[in-house]
UniProtKB/Swiss-Prot annotation:
Annotated protein name in UniProt: Kelch-like protein 15
Kelch repeats: 328-379, 381-426, 428-473
Keywords of this entry: Kelch repeat, Nucleus, Repeat, Ubl conjugation pathway
Chief place where the protein resides: nucleus
Disulfide topology: none
Molecular function per GO: ubiquitin-like ligase-substrate adaptor activity
Lineage of origin: Eukaryota, Metazoa, Chordata, Craniata, Vertebrata
GO cellular component: Cul3-RING ubiquitin ligase complex; nucleus
Free-text function comment from the UniProt entry: Substrate-specific adapter for CUL3 E3 ubiquitin-protein ligase complex.
Amino acid sequence: MAGDVEGFSSSIHDTSVSAGFRALYEEGLLLDVTLVIEDHQFQAHKALLATQSDYFRIMFTADMRERDQDKIHLKGLTATGFSHVLQFMYYGTIELSMNTVHEILQAAMYVQLIEVVKFCCSFLLAKICLENCAEIMRLLDDFSVNIEGVREKLDSFLLENFVPLMSRPDFLSYLSFEKLMSYLDNDHLSRFPEIELYEAVQAWLRHDRRRWRHTDTIIQNIRFCLMTPSSVFEKVKTSEFYRYSRQLRHEVDQAMNYFHSVHQQPLMEMKSNKIRSAKPQTAVFRGMIGHSMVNSKILLLHKPRVWWELEGPQVPLRPDCLAIVNNFVFLLGGEELGPDGEFHASSKVFRYDPRQNTWLRMADMSVPRSEFAVGVIGRYVYAVAGRTRDETFYSTERYDITEDKWEFVDPYPVNKYGHEGTVLGNKLYITGGITSSSTSKQVCVFDPSKEGTVEQRTRRTQVATNCWENKCKMNYARCFHKMISYNA
């Protein structure tokens, strides 16, 4: 019928328009503008330039003097760079090399041809290496390139190769104080020993004597407590900056106090001993193989399906209780192989320091324990109930981290093992477990603010106190389960 309307679209229209402009360009037809750059003249079509570049679109459509000009002089870019950009606007392809990318990027930024800018950035980041890193940094900075993801990828390379780069004079020359500070504050530098970061800072300072005025500020981003004492003595205290910088001397004194305060280290939270780690790490500490063999490996999940093996205490313990205090790991009790070839409950306690990857034997618990529960409140690690091969008990004791000693506190209400604990709001919650009669639904809360007197804190005391309080029971009896507190 006459009133019916049907629409049709061409699948080749866009291609034919582009091909049409290319044909006119190659034949030199209908060219209506000449662009003069340096001593070279480039003829083109205003319409095509305006569709490809916001710079030219504004030039030819807004109230600008160039709108009606046939010849336009452009300054601030090279003929070589613009020739590649113009070819891209007509043909959609561009060839890049380290010899030409500088001029092409300059021209693309000038005419606001973002697609070519992205190509240049991708090319540069694919070619980046130690030898040209400083040059690429300078290039991106010179043209204020702000393409999404480019700076992040550049920084990722810099952080991954920070120490090797800091041995190169060209990189040292270009790296600014502000950039250096931001890199030193970044936890992605964790792959480098802290002493190497300090030596890198020294190299930057020595490169230009005028930089020494920044010493006190920069040095605060070095974490001296992550170094070994020998490194501080031999490489920090002997440097010329130790004499020059009051802040450096203060940082060294603080680190030496930290090294000497062995037992207090887990409670000394400060920037200087904060582990450089860009994300939380997963570690597996010890375990069973079958029913009798002990797996003594400590494994760190480096990346998916890749585990790193760490050193561990040279004692054949199996299923230990574990407590974490400021990224120090305490392994407590469990069982160990005795001289009779059998496993017996252990009272041993070990502390792992991931900063130095070292283990330290701490004071033993007052009694051997296995299948017990632990919790950390303030400066104390609490060990609740548990058993040996011969008996189950309800004694509760706590470890004073600062004093490296154990003392008994108010006992758990009943003999129990196989229970679990977690801390919430400075209170220790104990759930489930096995009593003399059955698996338990019990939930009991320990409030350290209500602890009894020293005389009441005996291994077998039956003095009733207000320290332990029963809460609503669980719906199901549980034992050998796991429990965590959320938003504690």
